[in-house]
């Protein structure tokens, strides 16, 4: 089976057993996007500090806001989360789903002027195998080859119908880099990609600037933006991403015109801004799964009974009300409602609000008042408020809870270590939006965020997780997902708290901006 064009629909995402071309001839013949005007300097306010720009090694959304405008991937996702060809011109998939042969688009150049070849794709995948945060998606790979300059062949150890779903994930995407940069250590990747914008400067805690790449070649198979792919153009001269972590200051800058757009508008400001004719609001309903997860390598959260007691004590209505000013939905699942894999398996352990049960579990655990550190930050008020409310709920059942408040990059970095914290607060966005195995990958080997001893997650969970990826039918994969989710709840590998929307805003003279799971500045222009 060969696909030569546009969207791909996978069994995991759409319930079929094959990858199917979703584009139509009429779409191919439709008029392509053209910048209504070219020029100007776009300034966009981000809600958090950007911790780093090495997209292979960090799941931080703040990083994706910048890097996904600089880099491309072999395959990405469209707005419906179907795999979408990007730097791949076509893909041929063997009937047994073991050999994936990609033809690379010709004439694409890196920002350093070098022409893209299959050698660069191979080098990018090899670096990701070595340092990539989600490198487990490539564990199934047996070999990779480049028979010629425009062909990249991946041979798997076993049949994997969901391989395209895995490599198209943009949570920590396999961005394509020049082969000469493939040996760069983690967190030291030079910012040279093939995207419509190229890197200019990164001033820590202040801003990141990118500019139009004049030799960028748009993907003419498409007519406009499609997720992180499609037909992309840099209409503005430069984009400055300013790190405006205080919500009030960011909103004020938007109102005065100091910035053209804001990544996040707090609930308290939305009604006022909705009445401002100079500002346009956009809302993504299912954006953020508010979540906290434990460190299971350090006491007392290395004790399952302590973790279960903490889970039993939590009142999600109280936590989510404080986190979101009322803009939330409870969600006993690791999927958004309406997704193909949505299940409430294990949901009986969600939002228990059972202090008596919590005290009983604590008594059985042998807990002796050890400190439980809740690692959070103030840049994301929802995370700080969740930790604050949860700490009071834990104290009410006799747990010695204490907030550990750092700035976002420092908190994120500490959460990757095995010591110094017990629960970390974050939000999973693209992880959940993409659905399927990707929604649970953070709990599986080797990228298990809950820091199990020897970097080995719960064996039963891992068994069910593996079955999601290897199942030959959607029903098989759904059943495996339900079993994995139930086990995650039972072992308290992570605690989902609720679903929150995302409201973004731009000035009325900004054209072409569309909200997504990261800030996309392609096809965006500014009216004088």
Feature locations, PLM:
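Extracytoplasmic/peripheral linker and loop segments enriched in polar/acidic and small residues
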Residues: 33-35, 305, 351, 397-411, ...
